[in-house]
Amino acid sequence: MATTGWAATTIDSIAAKAGVAPQTIYAAFGNKRALLEGMRLAMLRDSKIPELMAQAATEPDASRRLELWAQLVRQQMETSYDVISIHRQAAASDPKVAADYRLVLDNRAHTLATFIHDLRAGLAPGLDETTATDLLWCFSNEEIYRELVEERGWSADRYEHWLATTLIAQLITIPTGMAGPRSGESSSARVTR
């Protein structure tokens, strides 16, 4: 799927690549959508992400917590980038996958908001949780990873270090002009002051 795309990939081609009969794939997953979800869950299960998340959640130091987050994002990208990319691509053409993908994004938003809420005492003065969550979402995005590592040739170590230092700079030591919306201002109307 990563090379041919979601629409062009068939169960028959997946089975041929895996060296099994198509019926084996159908018996195990039923369809491509379920196979994609199985791939996503397997990547998560086989990674260090749950351990890193638990470690970050209990880390009292805000800087160290963000370093652990950067390590977690790197781990996710190294193990799951192709699956994340396929899922996004499939969501653009398959309404059922789009609904699944929306749930993944909603879960991600909740996870990031919880992470920031737990970090709130360490946030830079004047930085509200909503803005901090938006920044964490943006900087942890798979497209930034792809641009820096795949397109610009950065090593995974360099990416992780950049992400950690960027998150620390943006969330703990806030630059001038990055405060959240003023009272009564919507998040879509944010401006730098």
PLM feature spans:
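Amphipathic alpha-helical linker/stalk segments
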Residues: A16, Q23, E37-W69
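Hydrophobic/aromatic-rich alpha-helical bundle segments in the mid-to-C-terminal region
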Residues: L119-T166, I174-E185, A189-R193
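Amphipathic alpha-helical packing segments from all-alpha helical-bundle domains
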Residues: E67-R88, P95-L123, T130-D134, H161, ...
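Alpha-helical transmembrane segments of polytopic integral membrane proteins
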Residues: I49, S80, E142-Y145
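Residues in soluble alpha-helical coiled-coils and helical-bundle/repeat scaffolds
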Residues: G30-A34, E78, A92, D106, ...
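Helix-turn-helix
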Residues: A2-A34, G38
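Short helix-capping/turn signature of helix-turn-helix
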Residues: F29, Q89-D94, E142
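Conserved catalytic core of Hanks-type protein kinase domains
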Residues: A28, Q76, C138-F139
